[in-house]
């Protein structure tokens, strides 16, 4: 199955995803394929909380929303681990957020190799196609942080990867500096 021949219609996916959430299972629909998103573990939660603290300290005008669903173009529906947006950007919106409101999507890898491949390969393309300015990937398996920026033509023009322990500069419109030393505690 590809985006040219999806497994199902997006509306069918939305019905399945809504039912699954009631049973602690999260699905995503990326490039026309149904994906199971593993439930986050404690280390995952700590990384997301660390990012929330970093963003709130340096950019109090923005909010990092964990687990907000994003309606991407065509046959793509994702639930990033977090999205950075302006305060109240999602007020009066339903459960699926407009990607135009998202300044940065965040994914933290899990213990699932299929989900990790999706985070590393498919989601950068999906987020770039949607015009999300920055995609931040915290890769626990690789012990690295990758910042994707400058979306255009269905891909990110700038991709910078640094191992945990380095200072990571997240570019405009985010404009946040991350001291990733703490992430060494969470390498798998």
Identify the residue ranges that each predicted region occupies.
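Gly/Pro/Ser/Thr-rich low-complexity, intrinsically disordered segments predominantly at protein N-termini
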Residues: 1-130, 134-188
